[in-house]
């Protein structure tokens, strides 16, 4: 794909020949349509497929932007010198070293229906036990919470690195002019980390649209398939039901969804950038 994009925009013949451009684009469209065309059965009318698409987008949106916004807040709060803040940053960074299976098993014990650490704490304070992973909204919350806890380390480090590149003189000049903390955040801090904010957003969207183990191990895709994701559906089609064509088709759909959100973020952040460069960045 990268080679095709490069040839399309660098080759002088393709650049000036409308007919060849049309043929080139048509060939790429045919390639993708062959990929998303199911070979075993027409699952486009399958409610499970569309429910998996919706679940994937919901989980990815809340977990990706939950990570991004929480990470920037923690980065600002811990961007200070001292042993205490170094330890705190290390603790957040260390969460990424946990394997996803181990993470899922730990959170399954924390939020298991009725007999779990969280429910034991609720009962100790006089509340009834709650089946967290057996309800739609709370099951999604557990998956999002586990994913945010697991992936927040790298964004914090990236935001801290960006914050340390902002000159202190800007803050000093703003204080002299009487700027409040909120004004300094909106007009100095946020513009200073805007490029890292885009990078973190794109990386998190790409990663969280591929959620699998958390959904598989924490909720099993339930209840009523309301936490089943596209990657989970690919796994079930390909390796459980041996419907390799359907699994491959869903994987192409997932690729297109990731491409749509990634290119949208890149293009919104820099609308003057040629769109083909955004395509190349996405492919890389």
Role assignments for model-derived ranges:
Residues 1-269, 273:
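A structural signal for multi-pass alpha-helical bundles of membrane permease subunits
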Residues 270-272, 277-284:
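Positively charged, low-complexity/disordered segments
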């Amino acid at each position: 794909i990268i080679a095709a994009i490069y040839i399309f925009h660098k080759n002088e013949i393709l650049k000036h020949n409308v007919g060849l451009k049309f043929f080139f684009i048509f060939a790429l469209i045919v390639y993708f349509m062959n990929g998303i065309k199911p070979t075993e059965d027409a699952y486009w009318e399958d409610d499970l497929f569309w429910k998996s698409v919706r679940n994937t987008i919901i989980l990815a949106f809340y977990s990706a932007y939950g990570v991004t916004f929480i990470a920037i807040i923690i980065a600002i709060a811990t961007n200070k010198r001292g042993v205490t803040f170094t330890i705190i940053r290390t603790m957040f960074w260390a969460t990424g070293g946990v394997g996803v299976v181990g993470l899922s098993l730990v959170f399954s014990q924390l939020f298991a229906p009725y007999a779990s650490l969280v429910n034991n704490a609720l009962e100790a304070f006089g509340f009834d036990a709650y089946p967290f992973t057996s309800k739609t909204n709370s099951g999604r919350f557990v998956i999002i919470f586990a994913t945010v806890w697991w992936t927040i380390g790298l964004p914090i480090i990236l935001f801290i690195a960006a914050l340390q590149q902002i000159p202190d003189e800007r803050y000093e000049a703003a204080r002299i002019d009487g700027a409040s903390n909120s004004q300094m955040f909106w007009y100095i801090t946020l513009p200073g980390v805007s490029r890292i904010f885009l990078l973190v957003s794109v990386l998190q969207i790409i990663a969280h649209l591929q959620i699998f183990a958390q959904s598989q191990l924490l909720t099993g895709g339930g209840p009523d398939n309301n936490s089943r994701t596209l990657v989970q559906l690919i796994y079930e089609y390909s390796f459980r039901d041996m419907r390799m064509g359907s699994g491959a088709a869903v994987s192409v759909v997932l690729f297109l969804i990731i491409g749509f959100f990634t290119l949208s973020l890149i293009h919104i952040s820099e609308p003057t950038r040629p769109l083909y460069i955004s395509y190349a960045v996405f492919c890389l």
